């Protein structure tokens, strides 16, 4: 049985995520009541589509939950015009978001448009000043180890707060191989950069392995400022383990 303190540590790393395409306010409220209000240990953040930011912000304030509010931009394909992405960030800020999860234009990176990607990241970082910025590289769509490494390097260089693996909307989410490559770049950085694993973090065992990788390769304890686990059901599964 996993040490209860380790389980609690993992729960504090979770970005409790609901990015369901067919959704409505009533379903969102039920989810908040069940998965957040019923959690034995609060997660680091709640991540929802921009349309639900105001609703979730109100819920967090009324319940006095010390939980960050996150949303997604340039999601999920990473192909929106930069001006539209900047508008999404402005809307998210006005709606009370604390954190922005932005998809890297990884298709541009795959086609060799490195400078375009660099300029995109610089603009997004400037627009999200004062907010925590997590950049999703969509590691499952990057063909080679070198591409994963390059994407991570660009995100680190941009001043983003976290490098995130996946949207959860493509076939391949986070893998241990991709995590190792990304963490090696993060560990070599001359400034603190967080790591967020998402897309397929469905089991407690896998989450434990990812946290172990983070701590092994960076030499740092996994805390919410340094690592996140993006997941929809993991928090509930971890809560159940605490009940045993």
What label would you give each PLM region?
Residues 2-41, 51-195, 204-232, 240-244:
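Alpha/beta enzyme core
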Residues 198:
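Terminal helix/beta-alpha structural elements that buttress the NAD(P)+-binding lobe
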Residues 201:
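Short donor-sugar binding/catalytic loops of nucleotide-sugar-dependent glycosyltransferases
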Residues 237:
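N-terminal beta-loop-helix "entrance" segment that forms/cooperates
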């Amino acid at each position: 049985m996993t040490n209860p303190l380790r389980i609690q540590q993992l729960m504090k790393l979770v970005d409790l995520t609901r990015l369901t395409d067919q959704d409505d306010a009533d379903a969102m409220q039920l989810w908040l009541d069940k998965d957040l209000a019923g959690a034995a240990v609060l997660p680091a953040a709640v991540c929802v589509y921009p349309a639900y930011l105001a609703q979730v912000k109100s819920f967090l304030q009324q319940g006095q939950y010390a939980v960050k509010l996150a949303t997604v931009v340039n999601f999920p394909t990473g192909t929106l015009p930069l001006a539209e992405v900047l508008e999404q960030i402005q809307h998210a800020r006005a709606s009370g978001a604390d954190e922005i999860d932005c998809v890297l234009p990884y298709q541009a990176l795959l086609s060799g448009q490195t400078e375009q990607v660099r300029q995109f990241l610089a603009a997004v970082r400037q627009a999200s000043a004062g907010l925590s910025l997590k950049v999703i590289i969509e590691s499952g769509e990057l063909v080679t180890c070198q591409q994963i490494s390059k994407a991570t390097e660009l995100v680190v260089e941009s001043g983003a707060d976290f490098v995130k693996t996946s949207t959860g909307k493509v076939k391949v989410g986070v893998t241990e191989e991709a995590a190792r490559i990304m963490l090696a770049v993060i560990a070599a950085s001359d400034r603190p950069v967080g790591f967020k694993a998402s897309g397929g973090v469905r089991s407690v065992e896998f989450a434990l392995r990812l946290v172990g990788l983070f701590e092994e390769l960076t030499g740092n304890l996994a805390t919410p400022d340094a690592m996140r686990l993006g997941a929809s059901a993991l928090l509930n599964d971890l809560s159940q383990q605490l009940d045993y």
